[in-house]
Amino acid sequence: MKNQENKIAANKRLAELLGWSHIAEVGGALVGTPPAGAAASRGQALVPDWAGDWAAAGPLAVAYDVAIEPGARTSSAGGYMVHHYLHASKNTAITFAIAMVVMHKLASAQ
Protein backbone atom coordinates (compact mmCIF):
# COMPACT_ATOMS: atom_id res chain seq x y z
CA MET A 1 0.00 0.00 0.00
CA LYS A 2 2.88 2.35 0.74
CA ASN A 3 4.10 2.13 -2.88
CA GLN A 4 0.62 3.06 -4.13
CA GLU A 5 0.55 6.04 -1.76
CA ASN A 6 4.02 7.14 -2.90
CA LYS A 7 2.97 6.82 -6.55
CA ILE A 8 -0.18 8.89 -6.00
CA ALA A 9 1.80 11.54 -4.11
CA ALA A 10 4.42 11.67 -6.89
CA ASN A 11 1.76 12.00 -9.60
CA LYS A 12 -0.05 14.71 -7.62
CA ARG A 13 3.12 16.76 -7.07
CA LEU A 14 4.17 16.38 -10.70
CA ALA A 15 0.69 17.44 -11.87
CA GLU A 16 0.91 20.56 -9.69
CA LEU A 17 4.33 21.41 -11.12
CA LEU A 18 2.97 20.94 -14.64
CA GLY A 19 0.14 23.39 -13.99
CA TRP A 20 -2.78 21.16 -13.01
CA SER A 21 -5.15 22.50 -10.33
CA HIS A 22 -8.05 21.30 -8.17
CA ILE A 23 -6.51 17.83 -7.93
CA ALA A 24 -8.41 15.21 -5.95
CA GLU A 25 -7.99 11.49 -5.37
CA VAL A 26 -10.94 9.41 -6.51
CA GLY A 27 -10.75 5.66 -5.99
CA GLY A 28 -6.98 5.46 -6.21
CA ALA A 29 -6.75 7.74 -9.25
CA LEU A 30 -6.29 11.50 -9.50
CA VAL A 31 -8.57 13.92 -11.30
CA GLY A 32 -8.06 17.62 -11.74
CA THR A 33 -8.18 20.64 -13.98
CA PRO A 34 -5.52 20.43 -16.70
CA PRO A 35 -3.21 23.34 -17.51
CA ALA A 36 -4.49 26.13 -19.76
CA GLY A 37 -5.19 25.02 -23.29
CA ALA A 38 -7.02 21.79 -22.45
CA ALA A 39 -10.48 23.08 -23.28
CA ALA A 40 -11.69 19.69 -24.52
CA SER A 41 -11.45 18.34 -20.97
CA ARG A 42 -14.49 20.41 -19.85
CA GLY A 43 -12.52 21.50 -16.79
CA GLN A 44 -11.72 18.09 -15.35
CA ALA A 45 -9.64 15.17 -16.50
CA LEU A 46 -7.84 12.10 -15.23
CA VAL A 47 -4.30 13.01 -14.19
CA PRO A 48 -1.84 10.80 -16.13
CA ASP A 49 -0.14 8.02 -14.15
CA TRP A 50 3.39 9.25 -14.90
CA ALA A 51 4.83 7.27 -11.97
CA GLY A 52 3.37 3.95 -13.08
CA ASP A 53 2.38 3.84 -16.75
CA TRP A 54 4.73 3.89 -19.74
CA ALA A 55 2.05 5.52 -21.92
CA ALA A 56 2.36 8.59 -19.68
CA ALA A 57 6.00 8.29 -18.54
CA GLY A 58 7.48 7.72 -22.01
CA PRO A 59 6.40 11.06 -23.52
CA LEU A 60 7.40 12.78 -20.27
CA ALA A 61 10.90 11.26 -20.50
CA VAL A 62 11.22 12.47 -24.09
CA ALA A 63 9.89 15.97 -23.32
CA TYR A 64 12.38 16.46 -20.47
CA ASP A 65 15.37 14.62 -22.01
CA VAL A 66 15.49 11.89 -19.35
CA ALA A 67 18.11 9.24 -20.10
CA ILE A 68 17.03 5.80 -18.90
CA GLU A 69 19.63 3.28 -17.77
CA PRO A 70 18.06 -0.09 -16.92
CA GLY A 71 19.99 -2.54 -14.78
CA ALA A 72 19.61 -5.97 -13.21
CA ARG A 73 18.75 -4.84 -9.65
CA THR A 74 18.69 -1.07 -9.93
CA SER A 75 17.91 1.31 -12.75
CA SER A 76 18.20 5.03 -13.16
CA ALA A 77 16.39 7.73 -15.04
CA GLY A 78 18.13 11.05 -15.39
CA GLY A 79 20.47 10.11 -12.57
CA TYR A 80 17.65 9.17 -10.15
CA MET A 81 18.39 5.59 -9.05
CA VAL A 82 15.68 3.15 -8.02
CA HIS A 83 15.89 -0.34 -6.51
CA HIS A 84 13.58 -2.73 -8.34
CA TYR A 85 12.66 -4.69 -5.20
CA LEU A 86 10.96 -1.61 -3.75
CA HIS A 87 8.42 -1.57 -6.60
CA ALA A 88 5.91 -4.00 -8.10
CA SER A 89 8.14 -4.50 -11.15
CA LYS A 90 11.21 -3.18 -12.92
CA ASN A 91 8.91 -1.21 -15.22
CA THR A 92 7.14 0.56 -12.37
CA ALA A 93 10.48 1.31 -10.73
CA ILE A 94 11.68 3.04 -13.90
CA THR A 95 8.46 4.98 -14.53
CA PHE A 96 8.58 6.15 -10.90
CA ALA A 97 12.17 7.32 -11.44
CA ILE A 98 11.12 9.25 -14.55
CA ALA A 99 8.40 11.05 -12.59
CA MET A 100 10.80 11.84 -9.76
CA VAL A 101 13.54 13.28 -11.97
CA VAL A 102 11.07 15.45 -13.92
CA MET A 103 9.63 16.68 -10.60
CA HIS A 104 13.13 17.60 -9.48
CA LYS A 105 13.85 19.44 -12.75
CA LEU A 106 10.61 21.41 -12.55
CA ALA A 107 10.97 22.23 -8.85
CA SER A 108 14.57 23.36 -9.38
CA ALA A 109 13.48 25.68 -12.19
CA GLN A 110 10.99 27.51 -9.95
Task: Label the model's feature ranges.
Residues 1-110:
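Glycine-rich anion-binding surface patch
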